[in-house]
Amino acid sequence: MTDSEYSSAADAVANLVRRVPGFPSEGVVFEDLTPVLADAGAFRLIVDELAEAARSYHADIIGGLDARGFLLGSAVAYQLGLGILAVRKEGKLPPPVFHRGYDLEYGHAALEIPREGLNIQGKNIVLIDDVLATGGTLCASRALLEEAGANVAGLAVILEVEALEGRKRLADLPLTVVGERSE
């Protein structure tokens, strides 16, 4: 087990996140979690908190959103003894797929999951991502999973950009936010 110099996951996020104004476009402040995830103690604290959220939402499967949600979701799924479903960016999976477009804080994108080979009907899936901004990514992921017959039981992220009000689009779902945005 790795000890941490931080008292909590929120403390680790507050001290390690790197904020980059103007990236990837003017007016956006990019929340770079690379230093947070690279710190073993901070990573453990974050995964522990995300796992507790997923446990409390009665997850059967963890849904990890492309790309940092893969890192977080895999660690959480492993800790809980669950499977991980990678919700992929458009064009990364062979057909047939469930497909959903959405708007980002700084553009447009689409997500996909396989249409065949999954047994997720009626399963409780907890979606894990790095940042909740506009809510577009999580809403699109939810729509994909519900179209496939799954139940999205809850959401867990490291950071929330409150000014973009993504939480409002997902108000009917339980949400865990590990860290607080300082700006």
Curated annotation (Swiss-Prot):
SUPFAM superfamilies: PRTase-like
Subcellular location: Cytoplasm
E.C. number(s) listed in UniProt: 2.4.2.7
InterPro entries: Ade_phspho_trans, PRibTrfase_dom, PRTase-like, UPRTase/APRTase
Group of enzyme by EC: transferase
Pathway where it operates: Purine metabolism; AMP biosynthesis via salvage pathway; AMP from adenine: step 1/1
Function comment: Catalyzes a salvage reaction resulting in the formation of AMP, that is energically less costly than de novo synthesis.
Subunit structure: Homodimer.
Name under which the protein is recorded: Adenine phosphoribosyltransferase
Gene name linked to the record: apt
